[in-house]
Swiss-Prot record:
Belongs to the universal ribosomal protein uS17 family. It comes from the Bacteria. The keyword Ribosomal protein applies. The lineage of its organism: Bacteria, Pseudomonadati, Thermodesulfobacteriota, Desulfobacteria, Desulfobacterales. One of its GO terms (cellular component) is cytosolic small ribosomal subunit. This is Small ribosomal subunit protein uS17. Keywords: Ribonucleoprotein, Ribosomal protein, RNA-binding, rRNA-binding. Signal peptide: none annotated. InterPro entries: NA-bd_OB-fold, Ribosomal_uS17, Ribosomal_uS17_bact/chlr, Ribosomal_uS17_CS. GO terms for biological process: translation. It holds the Pfam family Ribosomal_S17. Part of the 30S ribosomal subunit.
């Protein structure tokens, strides 16, 4: 299979939109503990590029991997799945 054209797509929640054209998205995933085999929720925060500046805190967004846009930004907001209440 061709791995070169495949880009990671992650689903997460916007936790910060204070920057200009950037948001911080927190992605949750289940990870199994190596010894105890219990599933634990792990969190990771990604800086993502938001060109339209429509994302608000609490929105559920889909982010797609892209070329490096800055020191920390490697993702773009591809769509807003669910708006915050």
């Amino acid at each position: 299979m061709n791995e070169r054209g495949r880009k990671r797509v992650l689903l997460g929640t916007v936790v910060s939109n204070k920057m200009d054209k950037s948001v911080v998205v927190e992605v949750e995933r289940l990870v199994q503990h190596r010894v105890y085999k219990k599933y634990i929720t792990s969190h990771k925060k990604y800086a993502a590029h938001d060109e339209t500046q429509l994302c608000q805190i609490g929105d559920m967004v889909k982010i797609t991997e892209s070329r490096p846009l800055s020191k920390t930004k490697r993702f773009r907001v591809s769509e807003i799945v669910k708006k915050a209440v």
